[in-house]
Structure formats: C-alpha cells, structure tokens
C-alpha cells in the first residue's frame, strides 16, 4: 500500500511514524514533509504543495490513499478535487471543512443543532463591532472568522485591548482577509480540553482526551502559539465530563453533519472548555491537533491505517480502538523569539538520542545535518505509567536537544 501524506509539521511526522507501522504500507510519500520524515522508516519526502501537482503525483504513482494533515488544503476543497479524479482521500469535503474554516459558520451550526457553546455575535463592520464592545462585560473573546494558524483568538481583558484587536483584525487586516469578519464571544472560565475523534459520517468515535498548552510562557502567560506541549489523557476529563461531552456536544454534532448532508469522512477535533456550569464547545477543527497528535497517536495501540480504512469503508462502528495504559506527554522546543520574529538555520543535535520519540516540525535536513527551519522546531514525546513519569521522560529527552536559541516551557503537564 502506498500513501501520500500532505503536510510538513510535527503532527504529520507523528502520523507518518504511526502509519509506517502498518505491515501493508510499503511507502509513505510526505508532501513536502520535513527533516524528521526524511529519515522516518518507509517515508520519502516529495517537494509538492499545489493541489494539481499532488493529484498528478497520486495518479502517476498509483497512490492507494491520500491523507491530509493541515486544515488549509481541506478548507480550500482538496478532497472534492481528488474525488473528482477518482482518487481515494481521507478528509472532509469543502462544506464540512467550513466547521473550521469559518468561525461564524461553525457557531451558527452549533446554535442550529443545540451544541452547547458560548453566546456570540458576528460582525463584518469594525465600527459596529466597536459599538457592541462598549456594552460588553469583560473579559471577552474576539475570534477572526477565517484560518489564522492558531493565532486568531484573543482574550480581551478590557475595551482598550478589544479595540486594538478589532483594528488589527478588521482594519489593518493582519490575517490577510481571515479577520475581516469576526466572532465576539462570551468568555468562559475553566479548563480547556481537546478531544480528537474520527468519523465516517455514520458514527463519531472519540480518541483519548488530551490537554494542549497554548501560551508561550510558563504559567500560561504571554501570547498564544500553535501549542507548546500536551498531555494525554486530560486529568480534568472525568467520566462525568466525558458523558456531558457525548450527550451535549458529540451526538448533536453528528446529527448536524447528517442533517446538512455533509461529505465528512475524516477527523473532528473538539476544543472544549470545562466550567463550573458544564462542558462547552469552543471550536471544531477538521484535522488532528498539533501537538495533541504527538501524544494521542503515541498512546494509540490500534493500527492507524486500519482505523482510517474502516472510516473510508463506513465501518467505524465495528472498530474498537485500543489504547496503551498510562499517560503521554510531549514538550515542544521553539526558536528564540517565537511566536513573533525568530531566526532559523541553526544546527540541531540530540534528535537521534531520544529515549522515546522526537517528532520534527520546523526542521530541515541539509547534507545529513538537522537544522532549524521554523518557529516550533520539534517536540519530545514520551509514555509513562503515571503522568509524572511521562513528563519526566519527555523533559529528559528535550534536554538532550541542542540548538542556538532553543526555548521550551518548563511546566508542561503541571500548569492548569
């Protein structure tokens, strides 16, 4: 079996590593991949990113299955284009992908199908939004409607920051169109949780829960990032929380997908807030999370390719996902200055010395030497019987990694 995997992050390295364990898989082409996938078992990087190039490659090389890692190609409709050419691809169609591609679309979907979520209002005019914000209770949350690489959500403590955010999103257009429309949302106090899941359109099967650490500094301080580390399972996801999630969020979501007749065979990522008033849905993503994937797939005992094939065959209800006992932790190492300005091109040592597993993201391989090429560079993932053991092992591995300006949080798994 030959697989084409689209993407270049730590998530895609984890997906490639997990899919390579399937005995039927002979080759995984990573488009474009990174320095980690370049050396991963059964993997080969191919320098392709445009949809038409990927379609041509899949056709010419008799690719059996294409798997899409990041959200942007899904929102752009890559699944529809592959299917029009008769090619097998895992991911939602363009309409289903709008659950992530447009915050207003997803909030309207939640409201229509009684998915428990925060109160909200949508604006396309900056002056109207500023007038509305004058009457709001703070803190308040402002979200760019479109894709913003995980950086389009700002929690505003006061009107001053809210005004600055609206001007940046809607007037200065910092997200190149994605913030021209905004969702202004009630702030929910609580603990965040991520539940990744897989659907064939007939059933949604949740994975083990996880917890991301979004902010750059220890103690959950500073600006949001794509994610600085994760743990799984999430200690706040009690049986009671998971039951509420299933009844008030998962089940109505599935009803909505079916009622809207969405072409949705793929991943649904539920971003949750666990509050004193119950469990709320903050957002949908239509792909695996990063860095959540690097702990969730590390705990998955079942074969990932078999699971995807069960979804493609509309037989997910028959698939019982097995998980390793214990816990997992991953710690992300970033370039100095991330998530703002940072330099790249620094030599990296220690990647191959890990006791568990290092998944590469902003890493390139030059003449056999690993070098930094992005903001989030890599992450060290580890399993342990206890959460403390998993955390300790992940930090032991991250401390082996060396590059100029390396930065990582010291409190992954310890902060609320």
From Swiss-Prot:
Keyword Methyltransferase on entry: no
Pathway involvement of the protein, from the record: Purine metabolism; IMP biosynthesis via de novo pathway; N(1)-(5-phospho-D-ribosyl)glycinamide from 5-phospho-alpha-D-ribose 1-diphosphate: step 2/2
Source organism per UniProt: Clostridium acetobutylicum (strain ATCC 824 / DSM 792 / JCM 1419 / IAM 19013 / LMG 5710 / NBRC 13948 / NRRL B-527 / VKM B-1787 / 2291 / W)
Every ATP-grasp domain range: 107-313
Sequence positions that bind Mg(2+): 283, 285
Catalyzed chemical reaction(s): 5-phospho-beta-D-ribosylamine + glycine + ATP = N(1)-(5-phospho-beta-D-ribosyl)glycinamide + ADP + phosphate + H(+)
Keyword terms of this UniProt record: ATP-binding, Ligase, Magnesium, Manganese, Metal-binding, Nucleotide-binding, Purine biosynthesis
Protein name (Swiss-Prot/TrEMBL): Phosphoribosylamine--glycine ligase
Enzyme kind, highest EC tier: ligase
Gene Ontology terms, MF aspect: ATP binding; metal ion binding; phosphoribosylamine-glycine ligase activity
Gene: purD
GO biological process per UniProt: 'de novo' IMP biosynthetic process; purine nucleobase biosynthetic process
Enzyme Commission no: 6.3.4.13
Listed InterPro entries: ATP-grasp (IPR011761), ATP_grasp_subdomain_1 (IPR013815), PreATP-grasp_dom_sf (IPR016185), PRibGlycinamid_synth_ATP-grasp (IPR020561), PRibGlycinamide_synth (IPR000115), PRibGlycinamide_synth_C-dom (IPR020560), PRibGlycinamide_synth_C_sf (IPR037123), PRibGlycinamide_synth_CS (IPR020559)
Cofactor: how and how many bound: Binds 1 Mg(2+) or Mn(2+) ion per subunit.
Family: Belongs to the GARS family.
Gene3D superfamilies the record matches: 3.40.50.20, ATP-grasp fold, A domain (3.30.1490.20), ATP-grasp fold, B domain (3.30.470.20), Phosphoribosylglycinamide synthetase, C-terminal domain (3.90.600.10)
Claim: Metal-binding is one of the keywords in the record: yes
Leader peptide range in chain numbering: none
CC cofactor: Mg(2+); Mn(2+)
Residues that, per the record, bind ATP: 133-194
Pfam families on file: GARS_A (PF01071), GARS_C (PF02843), GARS_N (PF02844)
